[in-house]
Amino acid sequence: MPSIVTVGTFDSDNVADVTKILREFDGEVAPGLPRLRRRQVFHYSDLYVHMQDWDAADADEAYRLATADPRCARLNDSLAAYFGDHAPTPDWDGPVDRPTAERFYVWPAEDVENLELTYSAVIVNTQRQEHNAEVARLFAESDATDIPLTMGTLRRQIYLWRGIYLHIQDFAEPDAIKVISAVWTEGDPRFLQLVDDLTRLIPPYDPEGNSLATRFYHWAAEESK
């Protein structure tokens, strides 16, 4: 079940207005979109991150499902008053015409059952496209160990859009900060080495804050039944 992820500028003062729009849509329209399984929206610094999970074979099919239905198009029109376009980061070295973030790493390769019942955490940094292979290699080596099991990670996806790096993890535990903090407290040297290796590849988006985005909206298909 691929995630369609869009990113742009956002003023967090508008959280209530955006939440109202989404609640109305997902309460009235989403139940008629049986292949839409989950929607989550996060804010971080001056950004929004809008994630949609669709029951689709791949990201291309999911994108068609998310954009072809005129009801979804009307929702996007309503959100456009609050979700703005974001220019590429200064050192971005990739395309600027993609409508959604590109996923370049996923673990595990198999679908996760009942994914809509999990809780997502989004870490925001920056990255150049040329580093995709190295970042993917580092995570693949780590995910081949027991670290994901110890951390409680059920799925890991990494996306890139105009230089904005998004590390998305799905957990059974609702408190992402608690889960992530526990890993730091335990101090597994393999995890700390991974962080050190990644630091040179994924500089912070906001050097003044932490990298964890705040989820302010969530809807899952089961909740509509």
Language-model segments: what does each one mean?
Residues M1-V49, D53-L166, D170-E186, R200-K225:
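Short S/T/G/P-rich N-terminal loop/turn motif that feeds into the first structured element of a domain
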Residues E186-Q193:
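Accessory, usually C-terminal, subdomains that scaffold auxiliary metal cofactors
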